[in-house]
Curated annotation (Swiss-Prot):
Post-translational modification: Tyrosine phosphorylated in response to IFN-alpha. 'Lys-48'-linked ubiquitination by DCST1 leads to STAT2 proteasomal degradation.
Gene designation: Stat2
Subunit structure: Heterodimer with STAT1 upon IFN-alpha/beta induced phosphorylation. The heterodimer STAT1:STAT2 forms the interferon-stimulated gene factor 3 complex (ISGF3) with IRF9; interacts with IRF9 in the cytoplasm. Interacts with CRSP2 and CRSP6. Can form a homodimer upon IFN-alpha induced phosphorylation. Interacts with IFNAR1 and IFNAR2; the interaction is direct. Interacts with ARL2BP. Interacts with E3 ubiquitin ligase DCST1; the interaction results in STAT2 ubiquitin-mediated proteasomal degradation. Interacts with USP18; the interaction is direct and allows the recruitment of USP18 to IFNAR2.
Phosphoserine: residues bearing it: S284
Keywords in alphabetical order: Activator, Cytoplasm, DNA-binding, Nucleus, Phosphoprotein, SH2 domain, Transcription, Transcription regulation, Ubl conjugation
Residue list for modification Phosphotyrosine: Y689
GO biological process per UniProt: defense response to virus; negative regulation of type I interferon-mediated signaling pathway; regulation of mitochondrial fission; regulation of protein phosphorylation; type I interferon-mediated signaling pathway
Entries under Gene3D superfamilies matching the protein: EF-hand (1.10.238.10), SH2 domain (3.30.505.10), STAT transcription factor, all-alpha domain (1.20.1050.20), STAT transcription factor, DNA-binding domain (2.60.40.630), STAT transcription factor, N-terminal domain (1.10.532.10)
Family: Belongs to the transcription factor STAT family.
Protein name (Swiss-Prot/TrEMBL): Signal transducer and activator of transcription 2
Length: 923
């Protein structure tokens, strides 16, 4: 930053010192501010302290000449005061007896005072917090803009100086030629006078040549300063781009355009100065004894060419790193045979109007690493940029359809990797070369991409991305292709933000300090208190990480995939706590209200999320329950929000209840997740098929409590196995009323097998074939014996609703809903016995308990609707024809009209398919 710019940013006490210094000086502050860049670039020490006044005289006349150039400011009313002050100062310094030396000493002393004030301010700021990064960036941008504006003035001043030198040199050539032709005798007074004039002209030409060289030297110095300011800005942009490739926020979109504007301005100055130096080179043909003008011009030209080479070479960049369209969130990973895109750009937007620029791409251009695979560009490896396109969009080469193919090794199929590195640890570099031509200058420009990992199978994508993360996080050299031959360890101070970037870039929300703390403990353990603890590459992605047997990166990447595919909205809105250890989970929940729950990622499964809640017992014990983790296979069938909404646990009385009441800390469940619930189904809508939905019910096993593997570390925690059940949209409230027990041991199984035991079709015919024999024993209990026997405890209502709805109650009467056709095929024998149990044995081989045959009920014992059915009607019902069945209308019983058809459910003692735990509803 320029010294004057730094002075302007000082606090008030130091600014007061600066005003006091200039109030006591003859040099006005307006002059100091307006020529700040030029003043700071001159060597005032040499002009003030050395005995030779040549340097002071040159600077003195340069100041006078610049002060005389401010006449164009008179057109601007705002510059009237500035113009007046500068003119006054120009008049005041001319009468000085030793004007050049006094002026040089004055400016030199003022610069020393300014440096003293700056040192005091810097010492005072050492104990204060640094300024905001935004303020620093704005200050740097302002300095660059000011320097560019100052260079415009300096270039114009050099142009005028060269023009004046050329005119004076022409005058000297003319006078010298005339003097040589008329030379007669040295004693001629007229000739002596002419010789004196010629000598004076020669001295003036020599002085002006030195001034021009000094002006060009100062201009080269200021251009060097500008380039030194711009290239770090360009490096910052490249670093931001590199970090954005691994998830960090990308650079501002306008950053590249701003850099292009600055770099183009700097290149224009250099090319203009190069043309001016060519003119000076032509003027150097006039030589005299002791003339150093030609050597000075050659030296300036060499400096300009060096600056141009630096600027152009660094300005050729890869604007968009290589990326496949199907994995935009993970650039720098390429698959053989798949297309990928990459874009290069020359940030110096200068192109000849008739010259096309051609870019050529290659893989591993200058490297021959042993054991590394070799690749070729399958498609065209060249891209041509026409002048018309360059003027319209900039000097951009967009490669959109590149494809890599592996080279075949001699004596083998494809080139196999025999090196020390795995395929996902091989780093390859894609290079671009452009033959740049402008104003007669020809230069070969080259740029490289960040190292890429080339895979042959998408299964390698996860480990390849781990390599990209590790390299771009730690490597100081972007071209180090053998980085993984001895991969360095990563400090947590770098690894933590990178892990957070994976979530912020992919699922729109990063990790907070508590979540990062859990990951840090998982990686380094509780005993490690160092902030910069080091983690090896093997521990990050290869070695198993406790408590599960999964490498850390595999576990984390599966969670990323799960959140992106199924939980993105919940994660973005902060509903998922996510990274919580078991101990931390207990500390959070044990002081909360009963029913408070949180969502965390399982540490023992790949891509699993579980729900844990707290319950306070009557004996003041605190129990923490956790559901078996849900993976993507489960969430593909049922969203997590619907699981939370309809989750049920069977209590001791077999009454289903939802234990999830408050999302941690105290947000009501429906308030937290209501906006994510699926739309309610219109119950009055007639459909061709019976609708169904999946809900989750768990059975709280009080007597036979077994802790699963994940809960063995915590004796006070219980993990309840969950099962997906198939039910009608109307079923859930009815289930909660009936208290139906679906099973004693339920498992999470996303594949709902229909089995041959229950048939549910939209037809009006219901076939119920439980076993060779069915024993109906009216009793307060219903026992289902699939494989491990399922016991249904007394409940006021047991509902089995096929298509036409059949209701049997444990009363002496059996009511059958009016329906045109109901086929109930029980078995070859139907035994009715007043016993306390109803046993449905659905297995292929069923052994029936002893039972007594009962008398068939008399007609008076039957319901009124059944008494009206004759034997012929029953035969028709047992063999219905297609004309009795329509899309939205059921066959009618005797005495029933079409308007009597309702959707009122009737309760039945029949139950089926206890093995699956299905509950059937019908309209």
């Amino acid at each position: 930053m320029a010294q004057w710019e730094m002075l302007q940013n000082l606090d008030s006490p130091f600014l007061d010192q600066l005003h006091q210094v200039y109030s006591q000086s003859f040099l006005p502050m307006d002059f100091r501010q307006h020529l700040a860049s030029w003043i700071e670039d001159q060597n005032w020490r040499e002009a003030a302290l050395e005995s030779d006044d040549a340097k002071a005289n040159m600077l003195y006349f340069s100041i006078l000449d610049q002060l005389n150039q401010w006449d164009h400011y008179s057109s601007d009313p705002k510059s009237l005061l500035l113009q007046h002050n500068l003119r006054k100062f120009s008049r005041d310094i001319q009468p000085f007896p030793n004007g050049p030396s006094q002026l040089a000493e004055m400016i030199f002393n003022l610069l020393l005072e300014e440096q003293r004030i700056l040192i005091q301010a810097q010492r005072a700021q050492e104990v204060q917090p640094p300024p905001a990064p935004e303020a620093v960036v704005e200050s740097q941008q302002l300095e660059i803009e000011n320097r560019i504006q100052g260079l415009h003035v300096d270039i114009e001043f050099l142009v005028r100086s060269i023009r004046q030198l050329k005119d004076e040199q022409d005058v000297f050539s003319f006078r010298y030629t005339v003097f040589s032709l008329k030379k007669t005798s040295s004693s001629d007074p007229h000739q002596s006078q002419q010789a004196h004039v010629v000598q004076a002209t020669a001295n003036k030409v020599d002085r002006m040549r030195k001034e021009v060289l000094d002006i060009s030297k100062g201009l080269v110095g200021r251009l060097t300063t500008l380039v030194d300011l711009l290239l770090p800005k360009l490096d910052e942009w490249k670093v931001q781009q590199q970090k954005s490739c691994i998830g960090a926020p990308p650079p501002v979109k306008s950053a590249a355009e701003q850099l292009e504007q600055w770099l183009t301005a700097g290149a224009k100055f250099l090319f203009h100065l190069r043309q001016l130096l060519k003119q000076l080179k032509e003027m150097s043909c006039l030589r005299y004894q002791g003339d150093m003008f030609a050597k000075g011009v050659d030296l300036r030209n060499a400096q300009v060419m060096e600056l141009l080479q630096r600027l152009l070479q660094r300005s050729f960049v890869v604007e968009t790193q290589p990326c496949m369209p199907q994995t935009l969130h993970r650039p720098l990973i390429l698959k053989t045979g798949n297309k990928f895109t990459v874009r290069t750009r020359l940030l110096v937007r200068l192109q000849e109007g008739s010259e096309s620029l051609k870019a050529e791409v290659s893989v591993d251009r200058n490297s021959d690493l042993p054991g590394f695979r070799k690749f070729n560009i399958l498609t065209s490896n060249q891209k041509t940029l026409t002048p018309e396109k360059g003027q319209r969009q900039g000097l951009i080469w967009d490669f959109g359809f590149l494809t890599l193919v592996e080279q075949r090794a001699v004596g083998a199929g494809k080139g196999n990797n025999k090196g020390p590195l795995a395929v996902t640890e091989e780093l390859h570099v894609i290079s671009f070369v452009v033959e740049y031509t402008y104003q007669g200058l020809k230069m070969k420009l080259q740029t490289d991409t960040l190292p890429v990992v080339i895979i042959s199978n998408m299964n390698q994508l996860s480990f390849a991305w781990a390599s990209i993360l590790w390299f771009n996080m730690l490597s100081p050299n972007p071209k180090n292709q053998q980085f993984f031959c001895q991969a360095p360890k990563a400090p947590w101070s770098l690894l933590g933000p990178v892990l957070s970037w994976q979530f912020s870039s992919y699922v729109a929300r990063g990790l907070d300090s508590e979540q990062l703390g859990m990951l840090r403990t998982k990686l380094f353990g509780k005993s490690c208190k160092m902030e910069d603890a080091l983690l090896s590459w093997v521990d990050f992605c290869k070695r198993e990480s406790p408590p599960g047997k999964i490498p850390f990166w595999t576990w984390l990447d599966k969670i990323l995939e799960l959140v992106h595919d199924h939980l993105k909205d919940l994660w973005k809105d902060g509903r998922i706590m996510g990274f919580v250890s078991r101990n931390q989970e207990r500390r959070l929940l044990k002081k909360m209200l009963s029913g408070t729950f949180l969502l965390r990622f399982s540490e023992t499964s790949e891509g699993g999320i579980t729900c844990s809640w707290v319950e306070h017992q009557d004996d003041h014990k605190v129990e923490i329950y956790s559901v078996q983790p849900y993976t993507k296979e489960v969430l593909q069938s049922l969203p997590l929000t619907e699981i939370i909404r309809h989750y049920q646990v069977l209590a001791e009385e077999n009454i289903p209840e939802n234990p999830l009441r408050f999302l941690y800390p105290r947000i009501p469940r429906d308030e937290a997740f209501g906006c994510y619930y699926q739309e309610k189904v219109n119950l009055e809508e007639q459909e061709e098929y019976l609708k169904h939905k999946l809900i989750v019910i768990s059975n709280r096993q009080v007597d036979e409590l077994q802790q699963p593997l994940e809960l063995k570390q915590d004796s006070e925690s219980l993990e309840v196995n969950a099962e997906l059940l198939l039910a009608h949209d109307q079923e859930l409230p009815l289930m909660m009323q009936t208290g139906l027990v679906l099973g004693t041991e339920l498992k999470v199984d996303p594949i709902l097998s229909t089995a041959p035991q229950v048939l549910l079709e939209p037809a009006p015919q219901v076939l119920l074939e439980p076993a060779p024999q069915v024993l109906l024993e009216p009793a307060p209990q219903v026992l289902l014996e699939p494989a491990p026997q399922v016991l249904l405890e007394p409940a006021p209502q047991v509902l089995l609703e096929p298509a036409p709805q059949v209701l049997l109650e444990p009363a002496p009467q059996v009511q059958l809903e009016p329906a045109p056709q109901v086929l109930l095929e029980l078995a070859p024998q139907v035994l009715l016995e007043p016993a306390p149990q109803v046993l449905l044995e659905l297995a292929p081989q069923v052994q029936l308990e002893p039972a007594h045959l009962l008398q068939q009920p008399s007609e008076s014992d039957l319901p009124e609707d059944l008494q009206q059915i004759s034997v012929e009607d029953l035969k028709k019902l047992s063999n219905p024809s297609t004309e009795y069945i329509t899309t939205n209308e059921n066959p009618m019983l005797a005495g029933e009209s079409s308007g009597d058809e309702t959707s009122i459910p009737y309760h039945s003692h029949f139950d089926a398919d206890g093995l699956l735990g299905w509950t059937l509803d019908t309209f």
